[in-house]
Protein backbone atom coordinates (compact mmCIF):
# COMPACT_ATOMS: atom_id res chain seq x y z
CA UNK A 1 0.00 0.00 0.00
CA UNK A 2 1.35 3.40 -0.95
CA UNK A 3 1.86 5.63 2.06
CA UNK A 4 1.14 9.33 2.07
CA UNK A 5 0.85 12.15 4.52
CA UNK A 6 -2.28 12.35 6.61
CA UNK A 7 -4.24 15.54 6.07
CA UNK A 8 -5.43 16.69 9.47
CA UNK A 9 -7.91 19.16 7.96
CA UNK A 10 -9.91 16.15 6.76
CA UNK A 11 -9.66 14.30 10.08
CA UNK A 12 -7.82 11.48 8.32
CA UNK A 13 -6.72 8.47 10.30
CA UNK A 14 -5.60 5.55 8.18
CA UNK A 15 -6.48 2.17 9.58
CA UNK A 16 -3.43 -0.05 9.15
CA UNK A 17 -3.64 -2.52 12.04
CA UNK A 18 -4.20 -5.86 10.29
CA UNK A 19 -5.80 -7.48 13.34
CA UNK A 20 -8.41 -4.69 13.53
CA UNK A 21 -9.00 -4.92 9.77
CA UNK A 22 -9.49 -8.71 9.95
CA UNK A 23 -11.89 -8.36 12.90
CA UNK A 24 -13.89 -5.68 11.08
CA UNK A 25 -14.07 -7.76 7.88
CA UNK A 26 -15.14 -10.78 9.91
CA UNK A 27 -17.87 -8.77 11.66
CA UNK A 28 -19.01 -7.27 8.35
CA UNK A 29 -18.96 -10.68 6.68
CA UNK A 30 -19.78 -9.57 3.12
CA UNK A 31 -22.21 -11.78 1.26
CA UNK A 32 -23.27 -12.09 -2.34
CA UNK A 33 -24.86 -8.99 -3.87
CA UNK A 34 -24.30 -6.77 -0.81
CA UNK A 35 -24.36 -3.02 -1.39
CA UNK A 36 -21.74 -1.12 0.57
CA UNK A 37 -21.19 2.56 1.15
CA UNK A 38 -17.66 3.04 2.45
CA UNK A 39 -17.02 6.36 4.16
CA UNK A 40 -13.43 7.61 4.13
CA UNK A 41 -11.78 4.63 2.45
CA UNK A 42 -8.37 6.29 2.66
CA UNK A 43 -5.90 4.05 0.87
CA UNK A 44 -8.26 1.07 0.66
CA UNK A 45 -7.19 -1.16 3.56
CA UNK A 46 -10.76 -2.02 4.58
CA UNK A 47 -11.96 -2.03 0.96
CA UNK A 48 -9.38 -4.72 0.26
CA UNK A 49 -10.65 -6.85 3.17
CA UNK A 50 -14.31 -6.80 2.10
CA UNK A 51 -13.59 -7.03 -1.63
CA UNK A 52 -15.55 -9.82 -3.32
CA UNK A 53 -16.47 -10.10 -6.98
CA UNK A 54 -20.21 -9.91 -6.46
CA UNK A 55 -20.58 -7.02 -4.01
CA UNK A 56 -21.15 -3.40 -4.92
CA UNK A 57 -19.07 -0.69 -3.25
CA UNK A 58 -19.47 3.05 -3.42
CA UNK A 59 -16.46 4.52 -1.61
CA UNK A 60 -16.56 8.22 -0.80
CA UNK A 61 -13.51 10.22 0.23
CA UNK A 62 -13.23 13.98 0.43
CA UNK A 63 -9.56 13.76 -0.59
CA UNK A 64 -9.16 13.54 -4.37
CA UNK A 65 -5.66 12.07 -4.02
CA UNK A 66 -7.09 9.10 -2.13
CA UNK A 67 -9.80 8.65 -4.75
CA UNK A 68 -7.19 8.53 -7.53
CA UNK A 69 -5.07 6.02 -5.60
CA UNK A 70 -8.13 3.79 -5.13
CA UNK A 71 -9.15 4.02 -8.79
CA UNK A 72 -5.68 2.82 -9.77
CA UNK A 73 -5.51 0.14 -7.06
CA UNK A 74 -8.90 -1.45 -7.80
CA UNK A 75 -8.91 -1.42 -11.60
CA UNK A 76 -10.83 -4.62 -12.28
CA UNK A 77 -14.26 -4.61 -10.70
CA UNK A 78 -16.95 -2.61 -12.45
CA UNK A 79 -19.01 -2.88 -9.29
CA UNK A 80 -16.75 -0.38 -7.47
CA UNK A 81 -17.30 3.37 -7.58
CA UNK A 82 -14.80 5.75 -6.02
CA UNK A 83 -16.16 9.25 -5.53
CA UNK A 84 -14.54 12.43 -4.31
CA UNK A 85 -17.24 14.02 -2.20
CA UNK A 86 -18.11 15.28 1.26
CA UNK A 87 -20.17 12.58 2.97
CA UNK A 88 -22.10 15.26 4.87
CA UNK A 89 -23.34 16.66 1.53
CA UNK A 90 -23.70 13.33 -0.29
CA UNK A 91 -27.28 12.17 -0.92
CA UNK A 92 -27.67 8.58 0.18
CA UNK A 93 -29.92 7.03 -2.47
CA UNK A 94 -30.23 3.47 -1.23
CA UNK A 95 -31.30 3.03 2.37
CA UNK A 96 -30.65 -0.71 2.23
CA UNK A 97 -26.89 -0.47 2.35
CA UNK A 98 -24.23 -1.73 4.64
CA UNK A 99 -22.20 1.28 5.65
CA UNK A 100 -18.58 0.75 6.59
CA UNK A 101 -15.65 2.95 7.34
CA UNK A 102 -12.97 4.31 9.53
CA UNK A 103 -14.80 7.59 10.11
CA UNK A 104 -12.91 10.88 10.14
CA UNK A 105 -12.58 11.76 13.83
CA UNK A 106 -13.50 15.41 13.47
CA UNK A 107 -16.94 14.73 11.95
CA UNK A 108 -17.82 11.21 13.13
CA UNK A 109 -20.78 12.39 15.24
CA UNK A 110 -22.16 14.45 12.34
CA UNK A 111 -21.84 11.46 10.02
CA UNK A 112 -23.68 9.16 12.41
CA UNK A 113 -26.48 11.72 12.85
CA UNK A 114 -26.78 12.07 9.06
CA UNK A 115 -27.02 8.29 8.71
CA UNK A 116 -29.72 8.11 11.37
CA UNK A 117 -31.72 10.71 9.43
CA UNK A 118 -31.04 9.24 5.96
CA UNK A 119 -31.06 5.49 6.39
CA UNK A 120 -33.90 3.60 7.92
CA UNK A 121 -32.58 0.18 6.95
CA UNK A 122 -28.81 0.66 6.88
CA UNK A 123 -26.32 -1.32 8.92
CA UNK A 124 -23.29 0.61 10.17
CA UNK A 125 -19.89 -0.95 10.83
CA UNK A 126 -17.14 1.42 11.89
CA UNK A 127 -13.82 1.32 13.67
CA UNK A 128 -13.66 2.60 17.24
CA UNK A 129 -13.01 6.31 17.73
CA UNK A 130 -10.45 7.52 20.24
CA UNK A 131 -11.60 9.02 23.51
CA UNK A 132 -11.94 12.78 23.55
Mark where each language-model region is.
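Catalytic cores of RNA-modifying enzymes
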Residues: 1-127, 131
